[in-house]
UniProtKB/Swiss-Prot annotation:
The keyword Protein biosynthesis is annotated on this UniProt entry: yes
Reactions catalysed, as given in the entry: L-glutamyl-tRNA(Gln) + L-glutamine + ATP + H2O = L-glutaminyl-tRNA(Gln) + L-glutamate + ADP + phosphate + H(+)
Transit peptide endpoints, chain numbering: 1-23
Annotated disulfide bonds: none
A Pfam family hit: GatC
Taxonomic classification: Eukaryota, Metazoa, Ecdysozoa, Arthropoda, Hexapoda
NCBIfam families referenced in this protein's UniProt entry, alphabetically: gatC
Keyword ATP-binding included in the entry's annotation: yes
Function, as annotated: Allows the formation of correctly charged Gln-tRNA(Gln) through the transamidation of misacylated Glu-tRNA(Gln) in the mitochondria. The reaction takes place in the presence of glutamine and ATP through an activated gamma-phospho-Glu-tRNA(Gln).
Stored HAMAP family: GatC
Biased composition range(s): Polar residues: 61-70
Protein name in the entry: Glutamyl-tRNA(Gln) amidotransferase subunit C-1, mitochondrial
Length: 173
């Protein structure tokens, strides 16, 4: 877990959020001064085909309905690195690659479903009338009560461990 000293303030032009992101993306070896050489090729996210995570238009599949998908869909190293960055999950092992490819193969089975003539839904409860209530604050100014639920806080923020590292780690045997 990375803790920021209480008196530390972000430099002008930087927010606390950007500092936390910088620290969270730094390996512990980088913080101690002993840097290990990273052999992975870095992705230039400005040159991505889709810089936004939300597609701007529907994706047209090259697979036709009813066509069987290949048994294994290979995933290149650059895609794995992007997935690791977005999901904060380490996929370095061969077992993780197999699990990822199995998940892609399972999800690609939906391409064989014939949806011709079926209108898209906005919600699964489209036939039910959903009533909305007025947006009124009923119990405001409870920030301190909410922050008491956190194990670690820093300047009115929850402190979370970077990535998928739990706050309390079990001792290794």
């Amino acid at each position: 877990m990375i803790r920021i000293p209480f008196r530390l303030r972000p430099p002008p032009g930087r927010t606390l959020h950007s500092l936390v992101r910088t620290f969270a993306s730094t390996k512990p070896a980088d913080l101690t001064g002993t840097q290990e050489k990273n052999t992975r090729q870095k992705i230039n996210f400005h040159e991505l085909k889709h810089p936004s995570k939300v597609p701007q238009r529907p994706h047209k599949s090259t697979t036709t309905v009813g066509q069987s998908t290949p048994t294994r869909i290979p995933v290149d190293a650059q895609t794995v690195q992007l997935l690791e960055r977005l999901s904060l999950v380490d996929l370095d092992s061969a077992e993780a690659h197999r699990t990822l490819e199995d998940a892609i193969e399972f999800a690609s089975q939906i391409l064989s479903v014939d949806t011709e003539g079926v209108e898209p839904l906005y919600t699964v409860l489209e036939r039910e009338r959903l009533t909305l209530r007025e947006d009124r604050v009923t119990d405001g100014n409870i920030q301190q009560d909410v922050l008491r639920n956190a194990r670690v806080t820093e300047e009115e923020y929850f402190v979370a461990p970077p990535g998928n590292i739990p706050l309390e780690q079990e001792p290794r045997k």
